[in-house]
Amino acid sequence: METAHGFAAPAVSALARGIREYSLFQAVLLVMDRLRQEYPGLGDEALYDQLEFQANPSLGFPGSDVDRVEFFEERGMLRARLRFNLIGLFGASSPLPAFYSEQALGDSEEGNPTRNFLDLFHHRLHRLLLPIWRKYRYRVSFQSGEIGRAHV
């Protein structure tokens, strides 16, 4: 994985190599922290817009929540693509008939239209999961050094 961001490249590749060790939400937060280092002026919503979510098309039993993360540059901005093993419309956890998963497994020179279409829904679904998780995990709504609203 090559990046044009000099000294930050080892940090990106180290995160990409070890991403399987983290849970779904930990991985998203780590990737957002990495993007925050690259773009300190962006807010959480703008950083979250730099993430792209996909489902893993593999039919094998997943060994972790996150399959992989890849960092890429698009329109001069560093972005991240996360591939998850949980909650997908194709792959091992799919609620759809196996036909769709088998069709999503195939690759051709111009890509896979079935996978690309269903990934639109995966992206939207996974974009909703982190705010829901944060809402019901009181401790993650605070950053270090902050004082809670109840104490003000």
Where are these regions (language model features)?
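Short secondary-structure junctions and interdomain/linker hinges
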Residues: 35-38, 42, 107, 111, ...
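Long, hydrophobic/aromatic-enriched structural stretches that serve as scaffold segments
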Residues: 74-129
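Short, glycine/acidic-rich hinge or "gate" loops at secondary-structure transitions
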Residues: 114-115, 132-146
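Short, hydrophobic/amphipathic alpha-helical patches that form generic packing surfaces
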Residues: 25-34, 119-131
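Conserved small/polar residues in nucleotide/adenosyl-binding loops
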Residues: 150-152
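The feature captures two recurrent sequence modes
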Residues: 1-94
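Alpha-helix boundary/capping detector
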Residues: 13, 147-148
